[in-house]
């Protein structure tokens, strides 16, 4: 069990860094234990309803609902809601690249993620689980993207910035997977946001905390529905609609401080896991086994 962490609300600068908002810039014109997972569910969920004595497929949950996966000891329970409110405790950043397994067989993973450690800024090189940095993206600012090789351009396009938000979520009139009303209290969550529009939307809310010298944990971000964005194939993807009401404020309780410490511990464990993967992959690349070495070992094993 982690020790109690004292949150001193009089020290904005120190806590802003701990909560991951000190590095936000404002422009004119963001292997560990299980945490409940929040996301936007883009596809409608179909169910069955009896109409005039016949079972008919109907849409029980619309696309664009917020989905919370509450992780249990053996399986997960899913909750959906059109409107939610989140009380953000902190945020972190990482880079992530999805690698599809095009030849996946039944029961095999369809792909895997290359991902970096989580940091309070993306303005530094981050170790990743492939033994490299930044999922292969070059260091520093790229002045001339077109001067890069086509392969490097393609790789960079595949790498996404991820804003990772930790906090407590309250779901308004939640329903289960069958669209049936259910009850749910305030639940701790992690939300990994990699869509660029959603990334900016939540970043704008965190930027307000900086301009007002407020801490995220003291306020609630209200996510009132989602915005549908049409795709060329006729389907849609959805992005959050967010607003922070600074007229309401929350005191920080002992339970909040414990949960804050739990989130910090989770991030440390996640980063330790990624760093372990990094060290192992670096070792594999620096100490490759040549064909001659393999033959020597085989010859040695064959000696009687």
Q: Regions from the language model: what does each represent?
A:
Residues 15-18, 205, 209, 266:
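Charge-rich, solvent-exposed alpha-helical interaction surfaces
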Residues 2-183, 231-237, 297-304:
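OB-fold ssDNA-binding interfaces and closely related basic DNA-contact patches used
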């Amino acid at each position: 069990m982690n020790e109690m962490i004292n949150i001193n609300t009089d020290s904005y600068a120190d806590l802003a860094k701990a909560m991951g908002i000190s590095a936000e810039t404002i422009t004119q014109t963001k292997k560990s234990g299980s945490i409940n997972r929040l996301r936007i569910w883009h596809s409608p969920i179909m169910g069955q309803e009896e109409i005039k004595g016949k079972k008919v497929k109907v849409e029980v949950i619309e696309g664009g609902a917020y989905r919370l996966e509450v992780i249990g000891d053996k399986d997960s329970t899913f909750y959906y809601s059109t409107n939610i409110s989140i009380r953000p405790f902190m945020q972190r950043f990482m880079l992530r690249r999805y690698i599809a397994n095009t030849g996946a067989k039944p029961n095999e993973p369809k792909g895997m993620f290359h991902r970096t450690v989580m940091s309070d800024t993306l303005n530094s090189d981050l170790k990743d689980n492939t033994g490299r940095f930044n999922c292969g993206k070059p260091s520093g600012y790229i002045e001339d993207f077109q001067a890069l090789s086509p392969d490097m351009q393609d790789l960079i396009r595949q790498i996404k910035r991820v804003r990772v938000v930790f906090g407590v979520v309250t779901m308004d009139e939640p329903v289960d997977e069958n669209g049936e009303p259910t009850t749910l209290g305030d639940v701790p969550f992690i939300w990994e946001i990699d869509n660029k529009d959603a990334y900016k939307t939540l970043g704008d809310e965190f930027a307000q905390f900086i301009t007002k010298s407020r801490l995220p944990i003291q306020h609630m971000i209200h996510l009132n529905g989602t915005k549908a964005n049409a795709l060329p194939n006729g389907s849609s993807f959805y992005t959050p609609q967010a607003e922070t009401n600074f007229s309401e404020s929350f005191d920080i309780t002992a339970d909040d401080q414990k949960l804050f410490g739990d989130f910090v511990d989770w991030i440390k464990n996640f980063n330790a896991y990624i760093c372990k993967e990094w060290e192992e992959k670096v070792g594999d690349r620096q100490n490759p086994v040549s064909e001659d070495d393999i033959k020597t070992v085989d010859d040695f094993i064959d000696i009687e």
